Amino acid sequence: MGARASVLSGGKLDAWEKIRLRPGGRKKYRLKHLVWASRELERFALNPDLLETADGCQQILGQLQPALKTGTEDLQSLYNTIAVLYCVHQRIDVKDTKEALGKIEEIQNKNKQRTQQAPAAADKEKDSKISQNYPIVQNAQGQMVHQAISPRTLNAWVKVVEEKAFSPEVIPMFSALSEGATPQDLNAMLNTVGGHQAAMQMLKDTINEEAAEWDRLHPVHAGPIPPGQMREPRGSDIAGTTSTLQEQVAWMTGNPPIPVGDIYKRWIILGLNKIVRMYSPVSILDIKQGPKEPFRDYVDRFFRVLRAEQATQDVKNWMTDTLLVQNANPDCRTILKALGRGASIEEMMTACQGVGGPSHKARVLAEAMSQVTNASAAIMMQKGNFKGPRRTVKCSNCGKEGHIARNCRAPRKKGCWKCGQEGHQMKDCTGRQANFLGKIWPSSKGRPGNFPQKRLEPTAPPAESFGFGEEITPSPRQELKEQEPPLTSLRSLFGNDQ
């Protein structure tokens, strides 16, 4: 409490404790009111240290006053307390809160009057001085005279042309540097351009065309010119080739004035637009965002080319709403379409911020892998559905289903599992088995049963021969074919190949 109550001390504290809360009341301000005010300021997110000075109290009053009409009684009490504290800091003698509020209102009214009188005094002082803002200025005698364009302005214009090389931003720069200039000043700016003579020749052709159009729309009136009246400017006069500087100043400052400088400036800007279009051959339709290009760089390129487009503002707005989204890369296009057609440039750049960066690439890769995983799982589930019912296994040892012989708990079957006889295993079983042709396999003759037979199979065992050196002459192949045709089963398999 001591730190909060240290706002006032000495004579100020005595003056504080003499002020009454209400007119004619008994209660007066105490230190507890300062402690309460400090806590309330903290609750309203205001710095309690501002109570230590008169300027701080004035700042707090300025913050609280707009909310008095809709505020609570606590806010009104806080405002009254700080108003009394301000009077104590300023050593303004007040007896109660109401008188302190009246003093505050008087001070605020005086400040408003000073604020209103300051612009009027500034305007009066400005009018008393001679205008030096434009090439045509007013001298001390009240006459309008021409002030030559400064070398600094010419140097700035030359640097812009050399650095930008007739990019779209050259036009607004020329318009700013030539504000209020006469045709003679504009010609001086054009003559300082050393290079780009092809562009300068295009500009001259445009000026000549506009001058001829001016002469066609503003024919010369027949008859002599009345005394005291100036002649009407021709197209060549506006271009500064057949008019003097005095005539140009007189036209621009006459009553009614003829703004020959603004007309000539408009012709030059028209020619500069053609030059900019020639130096910027890229169409707005060709501006597309690269796959890894940040959206901010793409927007910069888009609007740089859009400035060079010779179209109305409505058409440019349509290009911005349509082409900017259409020519973005797929990632940004998806985000921009989700925003809708009414999104501003700020919302677009905020939404596409970070697209193409490492974090965005990682997120896209994770989403793609998740989709592939889900698709693979779905395919596996679909394939599993076509396998039909699961086949049950059967044990070859006990003959029961649900397990195999390796896991069978029944005692091992003795003997051969093929023929059932004991004394040998299935791999050593000599039991014969018929093949798909009905022949016994394995064959005792050493040849498989489906092998084409080249000789007659004997139907009886051969007679015993005790002779030595006897040769058995095989019968000719043709005779074998005539005696016994190929097996029916082989013919059915191989056709006429045998």
Curated annotation (Swiss-Prot):
Covalent lipid sites (N-myristoyl glycine): G2
Stored SUPFAM superfamilies: Retroviral matrix proteins, Retrovirus capsid dimerization domain-like, Retrovirus capsid protein, N-terminal core domain, Retrovirus zinc finger-like domains
Taxonomic source organism: Human immunodeficiency virus type 1 group M subtype H (isolate VI991)
Bias-annotated ranges (Polar residues): 489-498
Key words of the record: AIDS, Capsid protein, Host cell membrane, Host cytoplasm, Host endosome, Host membrane, Host nucleus, Host-virus interaction, Lipoprotein, Membrane, Metal-binding, Methylation, Myristate, Phosphoprotein, Repeat, RNA-binding, Viral budding, Viral budding via the host ESCRT complexes, Viral nucleoprotein, Viral release from host cell, Virion, Zinc, Zinc-finger
Residue span of motif PTAP/PSAP motif: 458-461
Record remark on domains: Late-budding domains (L domains) are short sequence motifs essential for viral particle budding. They recruit proteins of the host ESCRT machinery (Endosomal Sorting Complex Required for Transport) or ESCRT-associated proteins. p6-gag contains two L domains: a PTAP/PSAP motif, which interacts with the UEV domain of TSG101 and a LYPX(n)L motif which interacts with PDCD6IP/AIP1.
Protein name: Gag polyprotein
Motif Nuclear localization signal per UniProt: ranges: 26-32
Region (Interaction with host AP3D1): 12-19
Disordered: annotated span: 110-129, 442-498
